[in-house]
Regions:
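Glycine-rich flavin
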Residues: 1-114, 141, 146-150, 156-157, ...
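Core beta-strand elements of the Rossmann-like FAD/NAD(P) dinucleotide-binding domain
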Residues: 69-78, 196-205, 216
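Flavin (primarily FAD) cofactor-binding/catalytic cores of flavoenzymes
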Residues: 54, 176-179, 193-198, 219
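Gly/Ala-rich phosphate-binding loop of Rossmann-like dinucleotide-binding domains
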Residues: 130, 134-135
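N-terminal Rossmann-fold NAD(P) dinucleotide-binding loop
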Residues: 126-127
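Residues at the starts of beta-strands that form the adenosine-phosphate
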Residues: 116, 138-141, 171
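Flavin (primarily FAD) binding-site architecture
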Residues: 82-95, 209-223
């Protein structure tokens, strides 16, 4: 889309639009095909797939509650917990406001394009969404508390990526700590502190992409 819109210099002319709702619908259809393919691979490998909510009840024992509420116990010499992860929402005032989303919520899809978005967190998820939305013509502000983007990786990589994003029109703010998010008449206002100075950036939406944690909620029996 970005190349087509900006293709006049290469002799590409014409009017082009996008439907973000259809884009997310396509994303969901691809994900569903991948899930179906994985199920087929597991079936071919003679792996029993049991649907339900699991809880480790005792060493070597897992209770699974099915959709009908019935509980079935399964036993094994070893148990591997591969329950995935969930988004982290730190205790920052305003992160509970409407329009503040996690990456999971954002991936559920949007009906209308966003004109502007503030992304809190310059890790892998935040950088990916910054690149995605900037290519769609959205005004993007990317906020990272550490000195560089992708702080878990080599410093040079984060610095180079910041330059690439800036060339795409992304406003990159590093060493910037979010103090609060407020609802205003023009959208959402994110108040920051950067090297002793107070800043404020605004957006139609705010994406909280600070990180994820392992999901173990309810996995272990209380006793």
């Amino acid at each position: 889309y970005h190349d087509a819109v900006n293709g006049a210099g290469m002799g590409v002319h014409g009017s082009i639009t996008y439907d973000i709702g259809e884009m997310f619908a396509f994303k969901r259809s691809v994900s569903e095909k991948l899930r179906s393919g994985i199920h087929a691979l597991l079936k071919g490998a003679k792996v029993d797939v049991i649907e339900g909510t699991a809880q480790i009840a005792a060493p070597g024992a897992v209770d699974v509650t099915g959709a009908d509420g019935a509980v079935t116990r399964y036993t094994a010499a070893y148990i591997l917990a591969a329950t995935g992860s969930v988004n982290v929402r730190p205790p920052i005032p305003g992160l509970e406001l409407p329009g503040v989303m996690t990456s999971d919520e954002l991936l559920e899809g949007a009906d209308t394009p966003y004109q502007s978005i503030v992304i809190i967190g310059g890790g892998v998820i935040g950088v990916e969404f910054a690149a995605f939305f900037s290519q769609l013509g959205c005004r993007v502000t990317l906020v990272e508390g550490m000195a560089n983007l992708l702080p878990q990786l080599d410093r040079e990589l984060g610095q180079n990526l910041a330059q690439i994003l800036k060339k795409q029109g992304v406003e990159v703010l590093t060493s910037a700590m979010v103090q609060s998010v407020e609802q205003t008449a023009g959208g959402l206002c994110v108040r920051l502190e950067q090297k002793g100075k107070e800043l404020a950036v605004t957006g139609e939406r705010v994406l909280c992409a600070i990180g994820r944690r392992a999901y173990f909620d309810g996995l272990f029996a209380a006793d």
